[in-house]
Amino acid sequence: MATSKFERLGGPGKFGAWVRYGGKPITQQQLDFAVKNYSVAILQPWELEAARYLKKHAPQMVVLAYKCLSSTRSYEPGPIYSSGLSFAQAVSLANSGKDFFAHRLNGDRIEWKGYSKHYQMQVWNPGYRWYWVDSVVREMRDSPFDGVMGDNDVENDYYGLNLPIQGVPSMTTIREGLDRLVASAGAELNGIGKILVPNIAESRLRWGKWERHSAYGGGFEEVWLGWGPNDYLASPYAVMQGRDIARGSGGDVSLGVYLTGLKRGASTQKKVTILRTPLSDRKSPLTGTDENFLYGLAGFWVFGGGAFTGISATHHDAYDEIPHAPELTFDLGDAAGGIVVQGTVQTRTFTRGWAALNTGSKDVTVKVPSNLVDAANRPVPSSFTLRAHQGV
């Protein structure tokens, strides 16, 4: 546990996140790099030996198993799957009269647009939710993983469902089903000492969603401050996203209820907050770090105040990389005050540094505290111009 008053998870001085959705087998070099540089890792659930290695050599690292909340995939050989309900099990249940596949109005199963062999499941069906929770909890009970990252906690139709479909007149039905699945899975996982960290899509659009869905371990924002290399959230929405996640990231999670004498109690830990921002392929002239990575990292510090767990930057769906930047080793310490707003620029002072980001579309000249140096150890002027969607 870190010594910061925020009690950050992941270990002191480590702020990187390893978000791995598959790809080539993990190498020993990648594992050793992760031990030195990452506060949190999301691995495929069958990568058990990698999880054991990370927990042995970096016990403070949060290591999560990927599980999709909304789909099953027909291409996975097993015996461990990235879904709560394997394709073969779902087919077997359907043949026995318990069909949990989603269907179009004509009766066809729904394969996700852009993701072949991914099939939408009936998240609104209590039966599907029961099988999902039962399967995942049994798998996690004696697992080296700290818990589960629940992917596709969706807010809108991202995969060509083209509503209405059978049993689903609108996205409200799907959202409500996911609300219930997250609550049920989270409570059951917490009961065995594990956490649930959903990939909470567009929480800024529904007041309180981040708080509710992160209540069982934390949350993951996959589109931090933007969707693509040049596709950013407009300034009001970027600020709303940052403040919404910061507000919802506080508080403790109760794990593994136990008995002490005649009293019932549980251990607690802080929530995990993971961010991922899209790479831009534009490099900082000072350190060579991707400009969007720096923008996201500045937001990580400004909005998180030193309490967020880890951040990553990748290309779209490029989740077999080991992203890193020199700036991820900069520990700014604890927040020395709140967020200071200068137009579309958000700044914050820390006990060992300062961070700022411009969420707007125009350049802004910002005032800088005295006695600061940059990454090259050069004195920082009292003011400078922060470009649109730039962070320092």
Outline where the language-model segments fall.
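Glycan-processing catalytic domains of CAZymes
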Residues: M1-V392
